[in-house]
Amino acid sequence: CYYGRDLKEVGHRQQSQEIGYVLQNPENQIVTDKVWHELAFGLESLGYDTPTIRLRVAEMASYFGIHQWFYKNVSELSGGQKQLLNLAAIMAMHPKLLILDEPTSQLDPIAASDFLETVRKINRDIGTTIILTEHRLQDVIPWADRVYVMDKGSLLTQGAPREIGEFLKREHHGMFLSMPVPMQIYAEVENNLPCPCLL
C-alpha cells in the first residue's frame, strides 16, 4: 500500500519518481562511469529538462559533499563513497519514500556510521520517509519511529523502540547484544522503568 493505494495502481513513472531504493551492494546500483553522470542518470531517464537536471545535480553534490569528487570516475571511489553516490542519485529525484536494503553491510564501521547519519539527516531535514533494513540496530534504534524485528525469517515483534526493548528484555532474547548500550544495561537490571531508547 502506497499513500492508501495498492502499489499496482501506481504507475511506473510515479513509482520511479516517488520511491527511491538503495541496494545492499553499491556496485550493483551504479550504471555510469562518472560521478556527475550517475547523479544525473535518473533524472535523464525520467525526461527532465537540462536546467532542472543541472540544478538538482548541483544541489545533491553540495548537500552530500560530493563536489570534491564530482568529476572522478566511479571506479576511483571507495565503497562508502559509492554508497553515498547511490543515495545522492536517488535523492536527486526527490522521492517521498526511501527504501534502503542493508545499505551498510559492505561498509566499514566508520563509513557505515557516516552513511546512517546522512540517512537520518535526510529524514530530519527533508522529511523523506525512510524504510531501512539493517543489522546495526545500535545505530538505528535511537532514531526510529517504528521497528520490526525479524528473527530466523519471521517477524518476532514490532512497535516503538521502547516497546521493542521491553519485549526483548521480557523474553531474555539474545538480540540485546546488538541494541544500544542504554537498552542493554536496562535489560540486565531488575526494574519496572520504561526502556531507554535514546543515546
Residue ranges and their predicted role:
Residues P51-W69:
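Conserved ABC ATPase "signature" region
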Residues S154-M183:
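Conserved beta-strand-loop-alpha-helix hinge in the C-terminal portion
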Residues E134-H135:
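H-loop/switch region of ABC-family ATPase nucleotide-binding domains
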